[in-house]
A protein has these predicted regions:
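Surface-exposed, glycine-biased beta-strand/turn segments
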Residues: 97-208
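Conserved, short, structured surface segments that act as functional micro-motifs
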Residues: 211-216, 236-279
Length: 279
């Protein structure tokens, strides 16, 4: 069965008989449901194994005594057995299975300006261009960071006004499920990077408004939308806690808030799974 939904982190010790073993790495909560993250133990190996699912590289963390693959599970994934492919140096390729459990998300009904639901031809063309660009950004894959934690602090203080996975209707019309966490806060509230990162995209988009994408390495990206101000540029390197912008209500928004998204192996997953204990 899926684990408890409490927010906690698994710190898997990798110290052992291997000389020079890395310290424990804090990982996100294991939640093997659509929109969740599955933590798949890969065992020991002197070098980091390569893991893939549907030919997409997966983030592998840990050290020689214990490696773990982090698998982002799409919201549309069916319940049942899923598999990843693993290749360790000096070993035969192997397939590792894990169970995906069903999860039903709540519904959210919103009212926005009609032009933000029934797009004009010009706005539709703009959206299509922006969507193609965003897909390129989401395909970013850089080497995994040598970090001892993936635990994130909330990027902004405030009330969680919208949770991940909500089945949304705008003006009575069904649209895509909510792909992030909404945090309500006053306009101008600083937004900070939850982990060390490189800025890989900034822009002002039709639905997302003023937006920043951060790359944390290994296919782990984070997204910040509806900003009133963007305070970074593409290519900037940020430390955890550095400002990247300020809360706003740009794009399709019903009020000032931050839409915070987490992308893992090109899949939007629940940001709450990455929050440090007590956050």
């Amino acid at each position: 069965m899926p684990c408890s939904r409490r927010t906690f982190f698994l710190a898997l010790a990798v110290a052992g008989p291997h000389a020079g073993a890395a310290p424990a790495v804090q990982r996100p909560q294991h939640s093997s449901v659509p929109g969740g993250v599955a933590l798949i133990p890969l065992g020991s190996a002197n070098e980091r194994p390569v893991a893939q699912q549907a030919q997409l590289p997966l983030l592998v963390v840990g050290g020689p005594a214990a490696w773990t693959a982090l698998v982002g599970i799409p919201l549309a994934a069916p319940a049942g057995t899923a598999r990843i492919e693993v290749q360790a140096a000096g070993a035969l390729p192997r397939s590792v299975g894990f169970e995906v459990w069903p999860k039903k998300y709540l519904e959210q009904r919103l009212r926005v300006a009609p032009g933000q639901v029934d797009l004009s031809p010009a706005d539709q063309a703009r959206y299509e261009r922006e969507r193609a660009h965003q897909r390129q950004v989401m395909a970013t894959l850089s080497p995994p960071l040598d970090a001892d934690t993936l635990a994130m602090a909330p990027p902004v203080p405030g009330r969680r006004s919208g949770s991940f996975g909500l089945r949304r209707t705008f003006n009575g019309q069904a649209r895509a499920p909510h792909s992030g966490m909404d945090i309500a806060a006053p306009t101008g509230t600083p937004v900070r990077a939850p982990l060390a990162a490189r800025v890989i995209d900034t822009g002002d988009y039709f639905f997302n408004g003023r937006t920043v994408w951060l790359d944390h390495g290994g296919g782990l990206l984070t997204l910040y939308c509806h900003l009133s101000e963007i305070e970074v540029r593409t290519g900037d390197l940020l430390r955890a806690g550095e400002r990247l912008g300020a809360v706003g209500a740009t794009g399709r928004a019903t009020g000032p808030h931050l839409h915070w998204g987490v992308l893992l192996n090109r899949t939007m997953v629940d940001p709450a799974l990455f929050l440090a204990a007590g956050a």
